[in-house]
């Protein structure tokens, strides 16, 4: 249990509100020449104003101002309020005045007098009314002003509140003060707090007789003399009260802080705010005391718990929190939250490559979004489905809607004005044209449209989309063989980092795969076998799976197991043609099959395949792949004793071959072997 007691949500005023009201009273009364700075009121009142729920799934974090610029909401704890006051140059005087007022309030009657005095002497309807009060020595505020709006709201809440609500605020105020009196700040100031002086100031303008005041004090004394162990009807309300708006602001900020802190960690930097962990711990201590009844009315708290559990790798807790969010939102007033919750669940499953569960959630979310005619969320679901298929293309056939249909739907979404929708549409069109081996001109056209729409917007507003653009540029130019261009994009991409936890975890696995390929080059077969065995126990995405398949094939070729390697190659080529349309990996496995035949001294059997592939890539317009196949053809010719034809073939195409640094080493090896063979022929003659 938190030392601040259970957290309770209320529509009535809170001890935190009462502190602000006291500061307004002191500011208007000009006690001891006090003038509370506007910045202090802004800092304290802003979190209590209505704010929209901020869901990290639906909102773009980059559109928010940086958390390092906007100060965090003040927690409903007196220690935090006093520390905010002490940041000002006259903070000591203001803090002492606040503590004096709080100590002077000795019952509901004191709160009543404070509220009446504020309404009577500090609040006016408009500036004209203010000018009419020429005899007033107090500062005054209009109802429409920033302070006036807050004051009017609090007065209205207090007036419509019943006796039980007022008793609750009094009881919670005692706990509010008691907790503070166990802090070092209280020990620092307690000897300078002047209670009687504040009492006199508060009562100075009250129209209450001496006899009435004595009667009030008598009954207060009489009540205090009762049995100290007696129960009150609201004993369960001891703890910390908070308004719905205030709690919303705190949870919103905590989510933004979590995302910012995670991004710092993923970039290898330390969090700049030294108070992040302390503040986060305090917020979670308070939220953990929230009753289940209140939590069900405030499901966003479960998103916060979900994010925190993900950070701590507590996946079961994360899943439970997400299910709670799903359950409580689905029973709320807003129908659209039902499919938003399902979408959240789908993205969670896909993050851990639990594809079957993700697909079920995606389809259910799509169905309900259509029933509710929520086009904005439906667009978002479509984008997430394509993102899922991009990572797991082998599951594309499991959806009732095809990628082509989704792209057409997004491109024709005339009822939305969000440029990101159209950027994503052309992004997926580019992806589809790449994997389906479209002509180079068509791929280039789609990529150019994707770039034009994405760069028209500020890239920082959707950095993930901008990163996708850069990664597609890298892939496009690399497959065409122009590494000088792809390197430019790759260097830029390496300097950026996504805040996605899935990307972070995947990067670790991808690094292991790179180490395994390096071990294969160094003939460290034991390490390669260890990585291959380890990969069997992991949930991997498509790229990781296909890379490991490629590693297995190259490993088998390296150890001379040509029969098994050829069987696996044929299986993988079939998968790339039927289950997944992946021309890039199909080409790599086709090249490996040619290598196996060459190593088996039956390279001539690969001749029909080489000729067919050359014709195919000439039609598509991929010069790099044509050159790679040309060199394989030369190896076959050399193997069957047609070295002169091979040399002639290289010589005729040398200018094209030298355009691609990727194949220069192999070209040099072939020319060197041809030169050695010519020398041998000369010696024989």
From Swiss-Prot:
Signal peptide annotation? none
Compartment(s): Nucleus
**Keywords in alphabetical order:** Cell cycle, Cell division, Mitosis, Nucleus, Ubl conjugation pathway
Q: GO biological process annotations for this chain's record?
A: anaphase-promoting complex-dependent catabolic process; cell division; chromatin organization; positive regulation of mitotic metaphase/anaphase transition; protein K11-linked ubiquitination; protein ubiquitination; regulation of meiotic cell cycle; regulation of mitotic cell cycle
Highest taxon in the source lineage:
Eukaryota
Naming one, the record's GO cellular component terms include: anaphase-promoting complex
Q: What's this protein's family per the entry?
A: Belongs to the APC5 family.
* Misc. remarks from the entry: Present with 259 molecules/cell in log phase SD medium.
What PANTHER family does the annotation carry? Answer: ANAPHASE-PROMOTING COMPLEX SUBUNIT 5
Function text:
Component of the anaphase promoting complex/cyclosome (APC/C), a cell cycle-regulated E3 ubiquitin-protein ligase complex that controls progression through mitosis and the G1 phase of the cell cycle. The APC/C is thought to confer substrate specificity and, in the presence of ubiquitin-conjugating E2 enzymes, it catalyzes the formation of protein-ubiquitin conjugates that are subsequently degraded by the 26S proteasome.
Quaternary arrangement and interactors, per the entry?
The APC/C is composed of at least 13 subunits that stay tightly associated throughout the cell cycle: APC1, APC2, APC4, APC5, APC9, APC11, CDC16, CDC23, CDC26, CDC27, DOC1, MND2 and SWM1. APC5 directly interacts with MND2 and SWM1.
Query: What is the name of the protein in this document?
Result: Anaphase-promoting complex subunit 5
Q: Which species?
A: Saccharomyces cerevisiae (strain ATCC 204508 / S288c)
What lineage does UniProt assign to this protein's organism?
A: Eukaryota, Fungi, Dikarya, Ascomycota, Saccharomycotina
